Amino acid sequence: LMEDNEFSQSYIKKILDKLKKELTIDDLEDFDLVQKQVVDWIGETIKIADIKLKTRPQVIVLVGPTGVGKTTTVAKIAARYNPIASDHPLRVCLLNADNYRIGAKDQIETYASLLSIPIASIDKDGDFVNKVNSYGTDTDVIIVDTLGCSHKDYEKIAVLRRRLDSKGAMPEVYLTMTAMTKASDMKEILQQFEIFSYNSVIVTKLDETGCIGNLISVLDEKNKSIAYL
C-alpha cells in the first residue's frame, strides 16, 4: 500500500523496521492494528511549522517554481489576516515582485482590490527594502509574491535573490511546491532554493493528486516542515 502511494523505499524501510521493533508477532497479524499504527507513525514524521508573527511588520515572502500557485496562495494568506474575513484582523499589505509573467500584475492587483488592501511593486534592486519601509510600522503583515523560477534556471534565481535583498532584515520565506511534483524534482527544488534560506514549505494543489507519499518521504528525508496546505 505504501508503494502504491509512492512512498520512497528508504521511508518504507524505516516504517517496516519500526513495526518489527515495536509490535509483537500477534500484533503483526492484526491488519487493522498495523494499518492504524503505520498511519500514526506517518503522521508523526510530518513536521508542521510554528507560524507566529515575530515582528511588526512581519514580511512573508513566497518563492518557488513557475505555475505552483504562489499568487493564489498569497491571496489566501492575505485573506486569513484581512479585516473583512478574519476573526483577528491585522493590517495587511502586498508587494509584487513578478514583472515577468504576462498578467501577473493584473492578477495580484485584482486580489488586492477584492480584499481592499494596498499593493506596490518591486521593480528593481533596492525596491524591496524601500517598499517595506514605506508601509511603516503601522502595517502588521507584508506578503510578497515573486516570479516563478525553474529550479534549473540559476540566472533567474540569482536575479530574484538580489531583488529580495533585505539588507539585514529577516523576512519569513516559504518555498511553494505542488503536491504533484515527482520526488526527484522535489529534491532538486528544495536544494536550489536554499539560497533564499526559506523557513518551511507551502504545498499546493493537494486536490489534484491522490498520492502524497512522495511528498511526505522527501520532506522527511530533507527535514523540512510544512507551513500551509
Model-predicted segments: where are they?
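G-domain G4 guanine-recognition motif of GTPases
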Residues: 8, 65, 95-99, 146-148, ...
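Conserved C-terminal guanine-recognition region of P-loop GTPase G domains, centered on the G4
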Residues: 111-113, 128-136, 153-225
